[in-house]
Design a protein with these regions (language model features):
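Positively charged n-region of N-terminal signal peptides that target proteins for export
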Residues: 1-4
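Bacterial N-terminal signal peptides
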Residues: 9-22
Length: 155
């Protein structure tokens, strides 16, 4: 009885093994094709920052810069609202040079106009090259609907 069970198991393994190998090969081919197609599509990333925390602000600048440096054709946008606005104000930012450098590299900084109104900030107070959007949250949602990757920066 044991011998028949073992024999049956071996026969099943011999019969099923080629099919399993074929499945693995097909999966590997699909993964390789997926990787190749991912490499041909430019990265599109939107960062969401609301914090005045220095660590969070350093992180968004570092991460946006690293993505842009690694993928020069990437579309990178940083959306600022809430308490994060000091990062892009001419007279308050401790990172003005970094922001300008990233803008020069093609990173887009967009400030929520609702937040600007709430904090009594005018466009003339923004670092050169920083733009505005009517609503920061709507901007992020729009980018996500277009297939952009989303990264929330938290302290």
């Amino acid at each position: 009885m044991k011998r028949n069970f073992i024999s049956s198991g071996l026969i099943m393994a011999i019969v099923l093994l080629p099919g399993l190998i074929n499945i693995q090969v097909l999966y590997a081919q699909k993964v390789a094709t997926s990787i190749q197609s991912d490499q041909s599509v430019a990265y599109q990333v939107v960062f969401d920052i609301t914090s005045k925390d220095a660590v969070a602000q350093n992180q968004v600048l570092r991460d946006a810069g690293l993505i842009r440096d690694a993928h020069p054709d990437a579309q990178v946008e940083v959306v600022l609202y809430g308490q994060s606005l000091d990062l892009i104000l001419k007279d308050k930012s401790t990172h003005a040079d970094e922001v300008k450098s990233l803008v020069d590299k093609g990173v887009s900084f967009k400030v929520c106009h609702i937040a600007m109104d709430h904090h009594h900030i005018s466009e003339s107070q923004l670092i050169s090259g920083v733009g505005t959007v009517p609503d920061g949250i709507y901007e992020i949602i729009s980018k996500q609907k277009q297939g952009w990757g989303y990264i929330k920066i938290t302290p």
